[in-house]
């Protein structure tokens, strides 16, 4: 499984948000395919946490690219973001939905749900995504359905597919950011067309 390098994240946030689709989020033995993301472009983006300036809560956003920004909402759900662009730019990509691939149980069609299913909590905030137990990788496995648990499992680990899996990307406004004035209408949510695990069409 080829881990994404730092340079992948140190690029335009919209590009990263689109190209994270189809990649694998790995936490320990749990694996899920990213099928929906949202881009948050920095302090000028009124929907972004960084628009309020640097705080203890959002400090990870101001750090180097390729780190996790994990925060809690409603006092009970965690959301995971991936920090993008240069250090201090304060932009990130929210992971909104995953397709379960290996040893993932429970719903994954929402940012809080996917964190719960993947065992992600605030202890992973500011975690380097180039580590060994929590990272994002290219999908270079050949998978099959496991009839007993209705999960995917690798049948040819490490065997590269002859061509990357292709899919159509849909763009929509982000969810739950009505307060962000004109930024609420920007099409900065991306998902894989036709995927059953997307949080909202």
What does each model-identified segment do?
Residues 1-144, 148-154, 158-201:
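Conserved, well-structured core segments that form or line functional sites
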């Amino acid at each position: 499984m080829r881990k994404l390098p730092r340079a992948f994240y140190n690029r335009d946030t919209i590009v990263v948000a689109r190209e994270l689709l189809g990649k694998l989020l790995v936490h320990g033995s749990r694996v899920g395919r990213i099928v929906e993301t949202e881009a948050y472009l920095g302090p000028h983006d009124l929907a972004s946490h960084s628009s309020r300036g640097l705080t203890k809560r959002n400090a990870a956003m101001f750090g180097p690219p390729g780190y996790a920004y994990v925060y809690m909402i409603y006092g009970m759900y965690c959301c995971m973001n991936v920090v993008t662009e240069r250090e201090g730019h304060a932009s990130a990509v929210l992971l909104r939905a995953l397709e379960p691939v290996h040893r993932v149980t429970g719903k994954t069609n929402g940012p809080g749900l996917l964190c719960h299913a993947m065992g992600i909590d605030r202890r992973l905030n500011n975690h380097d995504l180039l580590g060994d137990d929590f990272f994002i990788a290219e999908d270079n496995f050949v998978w099959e359905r496991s009839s007993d648990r209705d999960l995917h499992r690798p049948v040819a680990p490490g065997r590269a597919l002859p061509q990357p899996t292709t899919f159509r990307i849909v763009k929509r406004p982000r969810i739950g950011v009505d307060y962000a004035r004109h930024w609420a209408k920007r099409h900065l949510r991306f998902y894989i067309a036709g995927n059953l695990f997307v949080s909202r069409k």
